[in-house]
């Protein structure tokens, strides 16, 4: 049964078609794996075993009748940010206690329409605010990876830490995730999984709990590049319920895998060589450059001059949007309600008890930068910086660059309750230093495993592409995947 959970989505599809096992047997194997591992890893907050069995039986019926859909019988984990009809959805926040939506998010609707099976809801940073999955009301997720010879619990990254940990520990065949400033790509890099943040507007945001509406984008975390391509094809769509989703055809991403990269121009931005970057990250980046060169790509040095302003601008724009989006949680119609003497006190009590420390910090920052005396000085200036960042990328692509290669993170995974990180929020925010520019510009970015550090922990590389050109990212990421090889954690859970 263990071997079934190690299959990739492409392998699952082939073996289900050949009747080597049933969708129900596969689902039972995953449910058994979750039961064994979840107490230690804390990746799932809700396991929908009965629903999963029901969906798997329906898939078996279709497989028997010869009407298999693209994800028929494939068991997936769903980040707790996606509304799932009748299934507890609370963005891992106390303030949404016992909330069961009466509707389904567009992304999950698309996945179920393609035959996928829901195993349950995955842990995450509260309201997707965090880079370590330590802000969840349900407690931290534990990374399946450990230092060579060590037994210290490490973070899986965030905010999609549950998604990355579940995929890496073989607790689902793939997972949905979201990325506002790096929340797909950083956890993927920390767990040796593949994560793609598609172009803003590629996937509908309808039914996804909002953090920062102009930055949020859904995407998959998967075992390999091919699986990520398969999942994104099903997740992506135009949606009349989300006016920011773009009405352009969704290509067959899987077809891009294996295509030659000969003649492609890969840009190397000098601004990503940040001060204090570990030598191992620098060496891995050079290795990635050589792999692309060996595959026939042309390497060109480029400049993205406004990169250094991206992180401070992001931490103005994102909290500003969050403070507005999170104003709707007041204890009146759903979720946690803490009584007070009057309605104002009830609002105050509910929000004080319901939101965690990091969420409160960001709401306060956002409210501050939007306030009358500071709006021009902070928020408008940050939006101008955002325009300049977008223009930097446009100029690079106009000059003929096809994709940009950078490190995915400034370090490997760090320890849970790391004192340095907890003492200084800015140090935690620096985890997003290589990823936020992509969200600010609305571009696609993919993180792919590329090696291990001296302690045996995974490191990833990031590829950034033109808007709506995810195909080139899958094509180039596959080259890195082929050159670097596969990385799996040693089972300790």
Swiss-Prot record:
The record's listing under Pfam families reads: Amidase (PF01425)
List the record's Gene Ontology CC terms alphabetically. glutamyl-tRNA(Gln) amidotransferase complex
Entry-linked InterPro entries: Amidase, Amidase_CS, Amidase_dom, AS_sf, GatA
Entry keyword set: ATP-binding, Ligase, Nucleotide-binding, Protein biosynthesis
Catalytic residue positions: 79 (charge relay system), 159 (charge relay system), 183 (acyl-ester intermediate)
Q: What are the transmembrane regions?
A: none
What Gene3D superfamilies does this protein's entry cite?
A: Amidase signature (AS) domain (3.90.1300.10)
Q: List its EC numbers.
A: 6.3.5.7
Signal sequence span per UniProt?
none
> Which PROSITE patterns has this protein been placed in?
AMIDASES (PS00571)
**Any one GO molecular-function label of the UniProt entry:** glutaminyl-tRNA synthase (glutamine-hydrolyzing) activity
Could you say which enzyme class this protein belongs to?
A: ligase
Supply the SUPFAM superfamilies for this chain. Amidase signature (AS) enzymes
Q: Which cysteines are joined by disulfide bonds?
A: none
Source organism superkingdom: Bacteria
Q: Reaction catalysed? A: L-glutamyl-tRNA(Gln) + L-glutamine + ATP + H2O = L-glutaminyl-tRNA(Gln) + L-glutamate + ADP + phosphate + H(+)
The UniProt entry's GO biological process terms, in alphabetical order, are: translation
* Subunit comment: Heterotrimer of A, B and C subunits.
Q: Sum up the protein's function in the record's words.
A: Allows the formation of correctly charged Gln-tRNA(Gln) through the transamidation of misacylated Glu-tRNA(Gln) in organisms which lack glutaminyl-tRNA synthetase. The reaction takes place in the presence of glutamine and ATP through an activated gamma-phospho-Glu-tRNA(Gln).
Family the UniProt entry places it in: Belongs to the amidase family. GatA subfamily.
Name it.
Answer: Glutamyl-tRNA(Gln) amidotransferase subunit A
Which organism is this entry from? Chelativorans sp. (strain BNC1)
């Amino acid at each position: 049964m263990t071997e079934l959970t190690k299959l990739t989505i492409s392998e699952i599809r082939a073996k289900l078609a050949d009747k080597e096992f049933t969708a129900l047997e596969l689902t039972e194997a995953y449910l058994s794996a979750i039961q064994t591992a979840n107490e230690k890893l804390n990746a799932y907050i809700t396991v929908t075993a009965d629903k999963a069995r029901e969906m798997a039986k329906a898939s078996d019926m279709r497989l028997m009748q010869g009407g298999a859909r693209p994800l028929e019988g494939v068991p997936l984990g769903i980040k707790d940010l996606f509304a799932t009809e009748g299934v507890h959805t609370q963005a891992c926040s106390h303030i949404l206690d016992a909330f069961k939506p009466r509707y389904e998010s567009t992304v999950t609707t698309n996945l179920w329409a393609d035959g996928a099976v829901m195993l349950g809801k995955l842990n995450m940073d509260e309201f997707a605010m965090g880079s370590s999955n330590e802000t969840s009301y349900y407690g931290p997720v534990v990374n399946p990876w450990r230092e060579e010879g060590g037994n210290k619990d490490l973070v899986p990254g965030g905010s999609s830490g549950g998604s990355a940990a579940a995929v890496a520990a073989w607790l689902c065949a793939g997972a949905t995730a979201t990325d506002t400033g790096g929340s797909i790509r950083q956890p993927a890099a920390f767990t040796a999984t593949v994560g793609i943040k598609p172009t803003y507007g590629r996937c509908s945001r309808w039914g996804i709990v909002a953090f920062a509406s102009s930055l949020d984008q859904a995407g998959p975390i998967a075992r390999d590049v091919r699986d990520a391509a398969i999942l994104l094809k099903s997740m992506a769509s135009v949606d009349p319920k989300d006016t920011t989703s773009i009405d352009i055809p969704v290509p067959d991403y899987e077809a891009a895998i294996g295509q030659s990269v000969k003649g492609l121009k890969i840009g190397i931005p000098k601004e990503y060589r940040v001060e204090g970057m570990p030598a191992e990250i620098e060496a891995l980046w050079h290795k990635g450059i050589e792999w692309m060169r060996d595959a026939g790509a042309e390497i060109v040095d480029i400049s993205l001059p406004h990169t250094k302003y991206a992180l401070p601008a992001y931490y103005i724009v994102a909290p500003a949007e969050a403070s507005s989006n999170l104003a709707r949680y007041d204890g009146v119609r759903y979720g946690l309600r803490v009584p007070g003497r009057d309605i104002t006190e009830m609002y105050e009590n509910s929000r004080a008890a319901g939101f965690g420390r990091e969420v409160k910090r960001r709401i306060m920052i956002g409210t501050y930068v939007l306030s009358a005396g500071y709006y021009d000085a902070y928020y408008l200036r940050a939006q101008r910086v955002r325009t300049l960042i977008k223009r930097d990328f446009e100029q690079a692509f106009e000059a003929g660059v096809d994709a940009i290669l950078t490190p995915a993170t400034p370090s490997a995974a760090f320890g849970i309750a790391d004192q340095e990180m907890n003492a200084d929020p800015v140090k935690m925010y620096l985890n997003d230093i290589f990823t936020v520019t992509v969200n600010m510009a609305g571009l696609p970015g993919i993180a792919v495993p590329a090696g291990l550090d001296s302690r045996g922990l995974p490191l990833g590389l990031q590829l950034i592409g033109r808007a709506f050109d995810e195909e080139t990212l899958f094509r180039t990421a596959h080259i890195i995947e082929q050159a670097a090889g596969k990385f799996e954690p040693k089972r300790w859970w």
